[in-house]
């Protein structure tokens, strides 16, 4: 019989400083925690956290998504986070507050929302 290969346990790399990218659209909030080079350590979304439909685009859903991404990244030994916020959605501030409450020291908050220099025509105004 053939020998079964010896399986070694994969060692998790220890990262002290990281970056949190919060993409807050009007429909959903995506939180990705990366290392300094941009390699993703963990991520979570409001939709993947159990919220569907209009509840997905609430600040509470963004808070839950940020908590889930933060707890998943704690096994890498993260202490400090630099936060990059993109988008106009309702979960911008609550995601940053949730990361702060998860025990991370937030060193810097940067808004990286893309602003067009008169590029594409925006969608028409809603008539409700």
From Swiss-Prot:
InterPro entries linked: Ribosomal_uS11 (IPR001971), Ribosomal_uS11_bac-type (IPR019981), Ribosomal_uS11_CS (IPR018102), Ribosomal_uS11_sf (IPR036967)
GO molecular function: rRNA binding; structural constituent of ribosome
GO BP annotation list: translation
Coiled coil, from the record: none
A Pfam family that the UniProt record links to this protein: Ribosomal_S11
Gene Ontology CC terms: ribonucleoprotein complex; ribosome
Superkingdom to which the source organism belongs: Bacteria
Family that this chain belongs to: Belongs to the universal ribosomal protein uS11 family.
Subunit structure: Part of the 30S ribosomal subunit. Interacts with proteins S7 and S18. Binds to IF-3.
This protein's name: Small ribosomal subunit protein uS11
Species whose genome carries this gene: Pseudoalteromonas translucida (strain TAC 125)
Source organism phylogeny: Bacteria, Pseudomonadati, Pseudomonadota, Gammaproteobacteria, Alteromonadales
